Amino acid sequence: MGILYMEIKLKNDKESVNVLNECIELQLKKSQDYQNPNSNIKQAMHYRRGVDTIHDMIHQKLLRAQSLLEADGDPNFESLEDTYKDIINYCSFAVSYMRGKMEGQCSDRDMFNKPKVKKL
């Protein structure tokens, strides 16, 4: 987590904003694992079909949440709260990809990672 993030971190009484701050922290920590400086892998490379792949990931997380809600006991690994935080972060990835601003995204491809059609 960078110093700039710490300086601009919002302080307020709304728990929902606190959750968003936790999601930011989680996203930054996970990105250090998945897109570390020693790797050639960029974030956009995880989503071969662009936003469609991100939608698949969100759907997978929603199914996991449903499964956890229907279970009788506590989960062994990822909690329901963790799952919802992941959904929030995947939604931010979708918006980033739609804007064409995800790290490693090709500017000549659309939000589905298909070559852009040139207009005549």
Where are the regions a protein language model picked out?
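Intrinsically disordered, low-complexity regulatory regions
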Residues: 1-120
